[in-house]
Amino acid sequence: MYKLYTPKTATAETPVPGVLLLHGYQNDHETCAAYAIKLARRGAVVLCLDEYGHGSTTAGLINRGYVNHKVTVNYGEDSVEDGTFKTIGGQTRYKVMMNFSNLSFFDKHYTTDADGNSMTDSSAGGSYAYALLAAMDNVDPARLAISGHSMGTWSSWSVAANFCGTDVEPKAVVLQCGELFRDSAYDAANIHFNNVLLLQAKYDEFSYFRDYKNVVDDELLKSDLRTEFLGCTADEAAWNTTYGSFEDGTARRMELLNTNHRLTTHNAHGLATALTWFSDTIGLDLTLAPTDQVAMTKEALVLIAMLAAVASLMAVMELLLTTPFFSKAVQPLPGEASVKPNGAWWRGAIITMLLAAATYPFMTQLGHGLLPLPENIFRMTVGNGFLSWYLLLILIMLVTSIIGYQKNKKRGAQDGWQSMGLGTAAASGRMGWGLLGRCALLVLCMLAYLYVLLLICEKAFLLDFRFIWPFFKTFDAARFGQFCVYLPVFALFFILNNSKIMAPARCKATYLPGFKGFLGCWWRNALMMVGGILIIVLIEYIPFFMNIAPGADLLFGSTFGGPFMSLLILFVPQVLVFSVLCTYTYRRTGSVYVGALTAASLACWIVTGGSSML
């Protein structure tokens, strides 16, 4: 799957430059939109690809290939003797991810193993896309370039190596948060890379994009690896300075950006630098200044559309609740006598937040690569991280809920299940299975409505619901199957989570009508839902912004940094939106089911709709 941007000036009679854009891990072709729009507005044909395992591509991530070893420093700086070249075992997805930076054109010492495994296509489909772009009659084959972000930078290196020495070899490579390697890692005598620009994020959460150093500073700039790349001495090395010659393809530059890993794709400084680089290498028309950038307007409008679509779910719910069948999903709230004192609520809230913070870094990474799951069933890589975390929290919540229920029963409480948001007023002494089923049908109708809206948006505008990164996309059969696999665990987690948060968070505001009552409930619910994650945000970024190191790397080791730390920028806003939906639906229906099932479905949709699949 790809998206092609073609300016009106591109014809067979007047061919124009062509650029292949390759997205990063957990993203898709639409994440490249900022670069694509800016390049196309300046006269280039731009092809944005869904790489293996991402977006709508049917080939899984496993098609990149893998071997049974990994390198724990930059390639070409490793050795068996010092332990930086290691044999690995475990789950296939772990081996695949440990070989992201192992590239197909590296020496066989790296790309094959004794078990017959190999790196088959580290371009992740990029080479096929590049060949397609080069063959277009409105593209000048002498003016081709590549740019990739994160995982896409390894694909970019691979495409450039594959077409080196051909009539269509790329004249420039722009790496958005890329890893470097020594010339000794590959056949440097026969493989060369023309005019390489590295956009370096100062606060990159991934250690391999910082050369496994704690921070990005001048010491990193002057390392042997970096000076070899620039073609200069340590004394000559400087940020934001071009070395070499564009004419012979030796131009090199490292641009330091004051941003983090994920935001590099839309960083104005980086975009302007890249556009100038493309002008110098493939003749991109800069009549429109590099600083004239409109892509964020598109992102803002799509964000508004997504939020409006999600908010309209509440209107659909209200409409459905007026029908005789769904009106029975509305229950009265438990009596005010069961409201917890403020002190007891704060103790529970603090415990909840600390528990989430203590388990998030470990369980997400454990599930990401090491948890022994059937990989032909559980194929979502980041999804497995959340699955692992949710499973642990489910066990904890089940135990504490059972203990709490038994205590209430001994005290003679009459509204046990209703008090937890799980039962009806008519039969508060037992689980409300009928209520659950009715609420599930209600949520199914709401989701069907949202899917139709999304389908219209995709067909009419070639856009899904997102903000830079993929959120809601239409499903193919494989991804819908994954949605069905993960949804039961997500649903159980959110039902228990809302039962532990919404019901105990009842306060005087719960019984107040209108916005004042909603706000008085929401801030408590939001704090408990997102507070633990905010603790992790502070732990990760305070020492990082102080130029010490990412907090996760300092406290837990670099194994627990990277993907799930960089995900926090997406995860926190998602949870805040879920807290609004869950608070509103709990106050409206008197049970946790509608809010929990809605949040679970949306969260599962985000994880399975377009992100990485093995």
What are these regions (language model features)?
Residues 350-614:
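Alpha-helical transmembrane segments of integral membrane proteins
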Residues 184-193, 307, 317-324:
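Conserved serine/cysteine hydrolase catalytic core
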Residues 310-322, 403-404, 494-498:
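C-terminal membrane-cytosol helix-exit motif in multi-pass small-molecule transporters
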Residues 285-313, 321-346:
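Cytosolic-side membrane-insertion boundary helix
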Residues 315-336, 567-575, 601-608:
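Contiguous hydrophobic segments
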Residues 1-294:
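Soluble extramembrane regions of membrane proteins in the secretory/endomembrane system
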